[in-house]
């Protein structure tokens, strides 16, 4: 049953990769078409979760890159597909909802690096048309440090526009997490943009402060950049923080405890 569930998730993912700079030119990889939606409406509490979209970077999804010793096609640097945060969190959602949601995951490192030069409507055409019920935004690490007021404004404005475009397509619940490699300037601006868009911001800075959450603490890697990504423990912890945010959003205000 577990294997079948993971197969459904894998088939449901429409993958579009943007490789890390050290891995060479950008590459497109298309998987099988998404599986048909569940027969019944899926909900976690009050939160609809029929369609779930993950927008991230290499922590969310990275294709094989033999030059740096990475052979997976999932979130770097989990030891297996089912151990990255996307799949761990999807399993939690499916268990709570009583069915497997339709899932898309996309690496949008190109947005991180180009910000306002990235055409969101064209670059995320398929993802916008997907009209997800729940969107997890997990980016920031590939954006340059915000060394000037101009850079800070550009980053915030670009992030505002990204979230606004996502909100224009359907009526998604937005959850944005801070960076695994914490950066206060970027994290503060992502938080404000998220709150302005009516989303939930998840501070995961404590995860990157714990060496045990890094893949290098679990096994050896040829490339320091790969080793610096979350390992299985870090992925589990990241999923746990996001799941707590989902549960909070899923609880109607009228029944929340003070």
Question: Where do the protein language model's features map onto the residues?
Answer:
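N-terminal secretory signal peptides that target proteins for export/translocation
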Residues: 1-4
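Bacterial N-terminal signal peptides
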Residues: 8-18
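Boundary at the C-terminal end of the N-terminal hydrophobic targeting segment
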Residues: 25-26
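Conserved SGNH/GDSL esterase-like catalytic core that processes O-acyl groups on lipids
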Residues: 33-53, 61-149
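Extracytoplasmic/secreted cell-surface and envelope-processing proteins
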Residues: 62-63, 143-152, 183-188, 211
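Active-site segments of SGNH/GDSL-like serine hydrolases
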Residues: 136-143, 162-192, 196
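Charged helix-capping and loop-helix junction motifs
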Residues: 151-160
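Catalytic His-Asp segment of secreted/periplasmic serine-dependent ester chemistry enzymes
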Residues: 179-258
């Amino acid at each position: 049953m577990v294997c079948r569930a993971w197969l459904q998730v894998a088939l449901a993912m429409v993958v579009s990769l943007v490789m890390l700079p050290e891995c060479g030119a950008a590459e497109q990889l298309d998987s099988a078409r998404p599986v048909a939606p569940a027969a019944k409406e899926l909900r976690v509490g009050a939160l609809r979760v029929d369609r779930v979209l993950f927008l991230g970077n290499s922590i969310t999804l990275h294709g094989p890159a033999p030059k740096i010793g990475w052979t997976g096609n999932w979130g770097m640097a989990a030891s297996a597909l089912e151990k990255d945060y996307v799949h761990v969190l999807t399993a939690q959602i499916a268990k709570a909802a009583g069915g497997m949601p339709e899932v898309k995951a996309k690496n949008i490192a190109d947005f991180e690096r180009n910000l306002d030069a990235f055409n969101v409507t064209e670059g995320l055409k398929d993802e916008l048309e997907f009209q997800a019920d729940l969107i997890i935004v997990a980016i920031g690490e590939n954006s340059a440090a915000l060394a000037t007021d101009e850079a800070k404004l550009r980053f915030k404005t670009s992030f505002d526009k990204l979230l606004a475009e996502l909100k224009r397509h359907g009526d998604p619940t937005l959850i944005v997490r801070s960076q695994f490699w914490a950066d206060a300037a970027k994290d503060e601006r992502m938080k404000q943009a998220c709150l302005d868009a009516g989303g939930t911001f998840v501070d995961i800075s404590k995860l990157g402060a714990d060496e045990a959450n890094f893949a290098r603490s679990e096994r050896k890697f040829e490339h320091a950049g790969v080793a610096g990504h979350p390992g299985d423990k870090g992925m589990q912890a990241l999923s746990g923080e996001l799941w707590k945010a989902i549960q909070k959003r899923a609880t109607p205000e009228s029944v929340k405890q003070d």
